[in-house]
């Protein structure tokens, strides 16, 4: 799963793409070729960020549930394997 550095990278990319889209819209209008291209690329970045956030929430949710239910391996229940025995 992606970490916070991936989230930060995506947020920076989203902000940069948004600025490019706004600049293109000011120069070419809302239906200009570059405006639409930047808008579509921005949509992809936002979708990627949203998917990453959902994956992180799911992963954290599963880990929290496992710990809450006491299913996390404990040393007293599952001692370390000793190959010499």
Curated annotation (Swiss-Prot):
<comment type="similarity">
    <text>Belongs to the spo0E family.</text>
</comment>
<keyword id="KW-0749">Sporulation</keyword>
<keyword id="KW-0804">Transcription</keyword>
<protein>
    <recommendedName>
        <fullName>Aspartyl-phosphate phosphatase Spo0E</fullName>
        <ecNumber>3.1.3.-</ecNumber>
    </recommendedName>
</protein>
<dbReference type="InterPro" id="IPR018540">
    <property type="entry name" value="Spo0E-like"/>
</dbReference>
<dbReference type="GO" id="GO:0030435">
    <property type="term" value="P:sporulation resulting in formation of a cellular spore"/>
</dbReference>
<dbReference type="InterPro" id="IPR036638">
    <property type="entry name" value="HLH_DNA-bd_sf"/>
</dbReference>
<dbReference type="GO" id="GO:0046983">
    <property type="term" value="F:protein dimerization activity"/>
</dbReference>
<keyword id="KW-0378">Hydrolase</keyword>
<comment type="function">
    <text>Aspartyl-phosphate phosphatase which specifically dephosphorylates the sporulation transcription factor Spo0A-P and negatively regulates the sporulation initiation pathway in order to control the proper timing of sporulation.</text>
</comment>
<dbReference type="GO" id="GO:0043937">
    <property type="term" value="P:regulation of sporulation"/>
</dbReference>
<dbReference type="Pfam" id="PF09388">
    <property type="entry name" value="SpoOE-like"/>
</dbReference>
<dbReference type="InterPro" id="IPR037208">
    <property type="entry name" value="Spo0E-like_sf"/>
</dbReference>
<keyword id="KW-0805">Transcription regulation</keyword>
<comment type="subunit">
    <text>Interacts with Spo0A.</text>
</comment>
<dbReference type="GO" id="GO:0016787">
    <property type="term" value="F:hydrolase activity"/>
</dbReference>
